[in-house]
Amino acid sequence: MIRRATIGDASRIAEISIFTKRINYRSIFHDDKVSFGKMQVYPLAKEYIDNPEKLEGIWVYEDEFVKGFINLDGTGIRELYVDSFFENQGIGGKLVDFAIENYNSNHLWVLEKNIKARRFYGRYGFADTGNRRLENGTAEYIVELKR
């Protein structure tokens, strides 16, 4: 089931976010100080708990427990992460379908080198617009996808 995130989901959302970013972005950024030093579960969970308004655009996929989440901003997809233990089970697709059907989600930014994510979004009609910019504080580009 897909439902709005609550403060009770903060630690699970933080865990999924941090571990998925480590797995998928380490080979792109090559910065272990960030991946294993700066990116920590507890501070992110605490940030959600102390600032519950940060959960407002987050929807979780729950099947006994939270297995993934999508963070929406108007018609944009800000983040979508599925716990790596539950990848390839259709969870990400259900979250994208939910965003499209309920919020008319039609755009997002993704790391240019994140081919896996670009292919995934392509299956839902998202295509590269040709717009790109540097990701804040890095030397890596993000590209805009629209449907």
Q: Language-model features: where?
A:
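A short beta-loop-alpha structural element at the N-terminal edge
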Residues: M1-E15, Y25
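Conserved acetyl-CoA-binding loop-helix of GNAT-fold acetyltransferases
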Residues: V82, N88-E101, R119-R123
